[in-house]
Each structure stands twice: as structure tokens, then as C-alpha cells.
């Protein structure tokens, strides 16, 4: 995860994209990219172009991770906390 953080942070810094770093803009960008991902399934249940799906998924992940870094939060910890909460609400069935 640290390598990914470095890659994303450096990529954005080299393009001076930091001026756009607000929670609102990250949220909008995540939503827009998620909608673009969903378009691949709008008329069919299985997306035909896996590479395009991967590209849109990467966009969602990049914006999500960049938002975590902007907040000063560790994405792994955010995910672990959420899974603990979900596990309490939805116990295992096995």
C-alpha cells in the first residue's frame, strides 16, 4: 500500500492536481467514475470489455485512495474498521 500511495501522490503532484483536492471534488469524481463503470452493465449483465471495466475501476480506486491520503487516513484501517462494523451487523452463517 505504501508503494501505491507514493505512486499516486507523485503522479498527482507532478501534474499540480493538488489545487483540486477537496472532499467535495473527490466525492464527485468517485461518483462520476463509478457511473462510468456502471455504464458497462447498463444494457447487459456481463461487461464485454474487461480492459475498459478495469480502467474505470482503477479510476474509482485512485480517487478513493487519493481521498484517503488527503484526509490523512490509512485506507487499510478504514476498510478494516468498516468490515468490523459490517461483521457485527451481519454475523457469519457458518
Label each region the model flagged.
Residues 1-57, 61-94:
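Flexible "arm" and connector segments at domain edges
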Amino acid at each position: 500500500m505504501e508503494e501505491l500511495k507514493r505512486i499516486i501522490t507523485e503522479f498527482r503532484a507532478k501534474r499540480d492536481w493538488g489545487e483540486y483536492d477537496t472532499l467535495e471534488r473527490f466525492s464527485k469524481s468517485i461518483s462520476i467514475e463509478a457511473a462510468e463503470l456502471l455504464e458497462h452493465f447498463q444494457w447487459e449483465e456481463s461487461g464485454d470489455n474487461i480492459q475498459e471495466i478495469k480502467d474505470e475501476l482503477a479510476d474509482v480506486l485512485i480517487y478513493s485512495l487519493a481521498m484517503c491520503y488527503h484526509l490523512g487516513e490509512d485506507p487499510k484501517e478504514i476498510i478494516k474498521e468498516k468490515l468490523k462494523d459490517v461483521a457485527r451487523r451481519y454475523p457469519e452463517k457458518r
